Regions:
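Bulky hydrophobic segments
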Residues: 1-127, 131-132, 153-207
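Membrane-interface catalytic loops of GT-C/OST-like multi-pass glycosylation enzymes that act
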Residues: 134-137
Length: 207
């Protein structure tokens, strides 16, 4: 696993490029009469940084060259017991995904929608890792999805205990919640496989 300082540098070097995209997006919503609350906008900025953090931790954007050289493991549950720390880290990595989605969006209050989104995001990570950015492992897909599910249940329990805090002012007023999430995820992937490696290797000269 990368050092914390390295993770911060790599994730921030990609994140700065989505900030203007987010600003323009929320400005567009405001102009079209769909202004979002300050709390929601702030939480979305945090959520997007978290997405960059996931891709950084999983090794995406680590090299500046792209070559298709897949290393695939399709044997489920193999190595989970022998590598418990890695398994736990993969689980914890996706817990915020399951928490953020229902926290930010009304259309993600159903566990099926949340888990499916976490599964698709994790699957996208595994596919991109085939291009010289890590190993594609079905166990990661299973554990990441389980982490998303756990995050949802944490949100669900807290929302029952503190309903006003978890619903008032943070929920999106946009009818296109699901489209918005996939837009943010798409932009994150594009930046991390194109611009971010160039910044890291050419501008910052980090190996």
């Amino acid at each position: 696993m990368l050092p914390i300082s390295d993770i911060l540098i790599r994730s921030i070097s990609g994140y700065v490029f989505i900030v203007p995209v987010l600003l323009l997006y929320f400005l567009y919503l405001k102009k079209s009469g769909r202004k979002q609350s300050f709390l929601h906008i702030t939480a979305v900025f945090v959520f997007c940084y978290y997405l960059f953090g996931i891709l950084t931790v999983t090794g995406i954007g680590y090299t500046s060259t792209i070559s298709f050289c897949p290393r695939i493991s399709l044997i489920p549950f193999f190595g989970m017991i022998s590598g418990p720390i890695e398994t736990i880290l993969n689980l914890v990595l996706f817990v915020p995904m399951g928490f953020f989605l229902p926290f930010l969006y009304k259309k993600y209050h159903h566990i099926k929608t949340v888990v499916l989104t976490g599964l698709l995001f994790s699957l996208s990570v595994e596919i991109v890792q085939m291009f010289d950015w890590g190993a594609t492992d079905i166990n990661d897909l299973i554990i990441n999805t389980a982490g998303t599910c756990l995050g949802y249940w944490i949100y669900y329990l807290l929302s029952k205990i503190l309903p006003n805090y978890f619903r008032k002012g943070v929920q999106s007023e946009n009818a296109n919640d699901i489209v918005e999430v996939f837009l943010f995820a798409f932009c994150t992937f594009i930046i991390m496989v194109t611009v971010q490696p160039w910044v890291i290797h050419s501008l910052l000269n980090i190996g």
